[in-house]
């Protein structure tokens, strides 16, 4: 029987997923080392059983990675280069993602890591994927090309307080009684609650049968983005009207959304561009490997709203930037 890794390297601990995963791993007794960029500071918002080790490195600089990998059994790869303050800053993210993934894999191989668990995105390669989704899949291929057993989880829209997708949904529906949206809002997706994502990430670490696999993760509902907005409106008791127009390009949509939400245009643009791709699970093996009580879209929204009401102090540090009014 394969032993469960105990010493875990966590990348992206200041992010929406990473901050929650840090707490979950700590509660289950794993020893966690957080990889933090040289320009960042890890702020822990929730009480932990043991203080995580913090190691500073830059994935674009291979020479900074060996000390971070030393003594680790497994690693979570939760980083991506999307997220510049402007669309121009974001356009070069695919090349940065490739460099980061190659450097990380090389360092992991040299350090003798047994496993990597990567959270990427859904979408079929034949569907003319957006640059964002194509980059996430390319990163998975790079990580799975090496000697370290890499599990790639592919998710669609992740619903959680502070996350870009949920905050876009929240601000648009709260602020706009009438919405003019591109026709892509009719594209189907399979949203998943952030709580379920964390359960799958931890479950992969405990379940050796997931090693080396690519697994789709999604919630129980397959719905359009229009339906997501209407579900949010119903939960909040709001009356909203949505009209589609054929002329809104992703770039124009991103600039418009940036005016009414606090989410930077550099994050909005790749998310909006990806609306044209249907992102639903084609493979449900993970439901047998890691049984999880999946939350509905309505339940995920209710949980996210409850967490939002608690304020940024209850959330990982980077999320606070999406919660300003």
PLM features: residue spans?
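N-terminal Rossmann NAD(P)H-binding glycine-rich loop of SDR-like oxidoreductase domains
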Residues: 2-30
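Conserved beta-loop-beta element that borders a ligand/cofactor-binding pocket
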Residues: 120, 141-162, 168-171, 175, ...
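Substrate-positioning beta->alpha
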Residues: 100, 135, 164-165, 184-205, ...
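Conserved catalytic-site region of short-chain dehydrogenase/reductase
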Residues: 84, 122-133, 158-163
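SDR active-site strand-loop-helix element
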Residues: 11, 35, 78, 116-122, ...
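Conserved glycine-rich Rossmann-like NAD(P)H-binding loop of the short-chain dehydrogenase/reductase
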Residues: 30-37
């Amino acid at each position: 029987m394969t032993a469960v890794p105990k010493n875990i390297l966590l990348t992206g601990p200041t992010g929406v997923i990473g901050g929650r995963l840090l707490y979950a791993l700590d509660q289950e007794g794993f020893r966690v080392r957080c990889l933090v960029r040289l320009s960042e500071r890890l702020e822990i918002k929730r009480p932990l059983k043991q203080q995580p080790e913090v190691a500073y490195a830059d994935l674009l600089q291979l020479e900074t990675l060996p000390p971070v990998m030393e003594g680790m059994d497994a690693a979570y790869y939760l980083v991506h280069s999307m997220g510049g303050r402007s669309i121009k800053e974001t356009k070069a993210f695919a090349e940065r993602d490739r460099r980061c993934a190659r450097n990380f894999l090389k360092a992991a191989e040299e350090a003798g890591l047994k496993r990597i668990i990567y959270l990427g995105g859904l979408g079929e390669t034949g569907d003319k994927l957006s640059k964002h989704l194509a980059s996430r899949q390319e990163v998975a291929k790079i990580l799975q090309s090496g000697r370290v057993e890499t599990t790639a989880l592919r998710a669609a829209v992740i619903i959680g307080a502070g996350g870009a997708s949920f905050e876009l949904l929240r601000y648009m529906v709260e602020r706009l009684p009438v919405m003019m949206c591109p026709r892509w809002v009719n594209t189907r997706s399979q949203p998943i609650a952030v709580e379920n994502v964390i359960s799958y990430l931890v479950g992969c670490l405990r379940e050796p049968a997931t090693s080396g696999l690519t697994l789709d993760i999604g919630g129980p509902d397959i719905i359009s983005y229009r339906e997501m907005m209407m579900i949010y409106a119903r939960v909040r008791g709001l009356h909203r009207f949505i009209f589609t127009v054929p002329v809104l390009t992703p770039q124009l949509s991103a600039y418009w959304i940036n005016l009414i939400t606090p989410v930077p245009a550099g994050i909005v643009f790749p998310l909006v561009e990806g609306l044209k791709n249907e992102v639903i699970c084609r493979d449900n093996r993970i439901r047998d490997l890691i049984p999880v009580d999946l939350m509905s879209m309505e339940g995920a929204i209710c949980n996210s709203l409850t967490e939002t009401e608690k304020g940024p102090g209850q959330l990982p540090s980077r999320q606070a930037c999406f919660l300003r009014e």
